[in-house]
UniProtKB/Swiss-Prot annotation:
Name of the protein: ATP-dependent Clp protease proteolytic subunit
Localization terms from the record: Cytoplasm
Active-site residue numbers: S97, H122
Record SUPFAM superfamilies: ClpP/crotonase
Species of the source: Carsonella ruddii (strain PV)
Length: 194
């Protein structure tokens, strides 16, 4: 069981206790923590859509994730691109694989990481079993997904598709300065800026 701390929310109607995630959501802050899968994606997408329906002020998306299921991540990515609100992405800890794509998906100029964050990009991982024709179908789909992810990273980083394909051939780990140079983020959040 996960313990969620409660905080006091002060407003004109009086004080009330909120769990920490509800308080963060009220402040337009979402925390993506852990492996990206369908349940998490559904929660993140619904929070993004709710906040966007309230008003078009910026939404802050903190990311600490090893990545996960590509289709789940793409549902979050597509939602971010669809919103009227700008989404500021901030890596705290790690943004690997699909999480790195989401980090890059934030509004240009509003993508950050903390000094000790680690970012990793690579090609999608998958497996297939069954008849040879089924394995071939899945292999073609993996190549298609790789193309889509490389196009997304290219559009957000201004690196060529060729460069992205080359850089994602194997696990490619970057520190915050390398991530900034690569174009996945726009700035590093040092203590003096917080």
């Amino acid at each position: 069981m996960i313990f969620l701390p409660t905080v006091i929310d002060k407003n004109i109607k009086g004080d009330r206790f909120l769990d920490l995630y509800s308080k963060m959501l009220k402040e337009r802050v979402i925390y993506l923590n852990g492996a990206i899968e369908d349940t998490m994606a559904s929660l993140i997408v619904s929070q993004l859509m709710f906040l966007d329906s309230e008003n078009s002020k910026d939404i802050i998306l903190y990311i600490n994730s090893p990545g996960g299921v590509v289709s789940s991540g793409l549902s979050i990515y597509d939602t971010i691109q669809f919103l009227k609100s700008d989404v500021s992405t901030i890596c705290i800890g790690q943004a690997a694989s699909m999480a790195a794509v989401l980090l890059a998906a934030g509004k240009k100029g509003k993508r950050f990481c903390f000094p000790n964050s680690r970012i990793m990009i690579h090609q999608p991982l998958g497996y297939a079993q069954g008849q040879a024709s089924d394995v071939e179908i899945h292999a073609r789909e993996m190549i298609n997904i790789k193309q889509i992810l490389c196009e997304i990273l290219s559009s957000h980083t201004n690196n060529s598709i060729f460069q992205i394909f080359k850089d994602t051939d194997r696990d490619n780990f970057m520190n915050c300065k390398q991530t900034l140079k690569y174009g996945i983020i726009d700035n590093v959040l040092y203590k003096k800026w917080i």
